[in-house]
Amino acid sequence: MVLEAVEEDDGWATNRVALGKVILGNLDGVEAGVRQMIRKAPLEVTKVELPSGAEVTVPTLEEMLRIKAFLVVRRNQTRDYLDVAALAVVLGVDRAAEVLGQINEYYADQAHNGDGVASQLVRQLGDPRPADSQVITQLPSYRRLRQEWKDWDTVTETLGAVAARMATG
């Protein structure tokens, strides 16, 4: 999308492309760079009032879920799977699946193969294989992790339920 748009300009000459990150080139003899955005829509935020009376702007729970789910696809780390499972329980599996079923409206297809983020997410949530899988055995020793999430089977059951619901719509 971005690459095609800049290459349509007669004065543009592409030098290097790092997909999903940056396009470097020349625009009428001037070195230029364009950052490719992975988001297709702005963050959904809400204001929260702190006990002090100050207000902070934070992502909505649904947005937090989308961010963490995208990180599952992008980073494939245990901590992201844990966060998706925990947020799915807070929102409810049906609502979480509904939110994640629409993730393609928020994030661009990073693989550029037409499958979209949602398809890859269903695969990864349905069969979680984090790149840092050695961390899974350490979950019981995490001090501030809620007891239910120290059991990887609980995490995978929750993620599997979300994936199944996403797949069936």
What are these regions (language model features)?
Residues 1-169:
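Compositionally biased terminal segments of proteins
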